[in-house]
Amino acid sequence: MLCHWSRRIALAIGFLSLGPVQAAPRPAPAAVQVSEVASGLSHPWALAFLPDGSALITERPGSLRLWRGGRLSPPIPGLPKVYAESQGGLLDVALSPGFAQDRLVYLAYAEAGDGKSGTAVGRGRLSEDGTTLADFTVIFRQVPKLSRGQHYGARLAFDRQGYLFVSLGENNDRPTAQDLDKLQGKIVRLRADGTVPGDNPFHGDKRVRPEIWSYGHRNPQGLAFNPWSGALWEHEHGPRGGDEVNIIQRGANYGWPLATHGINYSGLKIPEAKGTKLAGGAEPLYWWEKSPAVSGMAFYDAQAYPQWKHSLFIGALADQALIRLTLEGDKVAAEERLLKDRGARIRDVRVGPDGAVYVLTDAPQGALLRVTPGEAK
């Protein structure tokens, strides 16, 4: 990995005040304390903490489990049928902003149809004892269904007003990320019931899907709101190189596949790419020349460990690490890689109610790890 700063490039439009920054120099890894708090999970993909400190965990083959008191429940009944081939399956999980009153749990998953598959989102009501999910209803479907098993995106995030944002991969069909009549390679904004807000940027334009909030994305598997600015941050997989962190702006084009810092897995240029920048498009805040294969993202805004304040934690699948980006406002000041010694693919990252960082390892016998700062080496 190249470890020098690239020069800042001012955006051609006013979406962002910062230019893209290549991966920053990394200090020597700091020690962390790690404990395995759950094991035997089948390719766990996401977790969401409940108000009582327990957590819901999705397993990609199609199960939802409750972790409570150090133990995993049996699979919770009441889930939809998922398309669990290749990269598909049961993916993200999020709680309703009003969960304490309504008990609604949102799930993103791959759904088969028309001979292919696409991302779907639904919600159901979790029983008080956490043993069943009732009245599951699909509230959103990616159309058309184009995936043969790749690039679902499928992260969920609610903003402070209760709107639901969903990241959608381009189903490994590159040009569709620029097609505004399709929902591939997009981030969409919905009401909590799945209906479309009238103030979405393209609402009323019959040539454009009204759900679209931003476009030009490849496979966005990180989505979270910055707790200090309120802005929506996203990260996405590049092809061979070019993983990105972006600040998402209303109606913006993030370039894929017309602009990328990556190349094809074959080593050849992306056929549609015109360079690393797209005229009138938004550039990444931060990018990597060598892809860590980013998945899952969490801002650290807890009080328990001040040394981690204003950090952004990101999972890495290929690099088998927990990436910590130190932030100064909307700038990345430093990067370090944690958990490298474990040799585990990190699929999701969340901050727990106790202030610890929790990560899921992606494996046939995956685990939930609790991570806290240790003594400096």
Q: Model-found features: residue ranges?
A:
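Beta-propeller fold detector
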Residues: S35-E36, S73-P80, T132-R141, T195-F202, ...
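Conserved blade-ending motifs and adjacent loop-strand segments that build the rim/top face
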Residues: H217, V332-P353
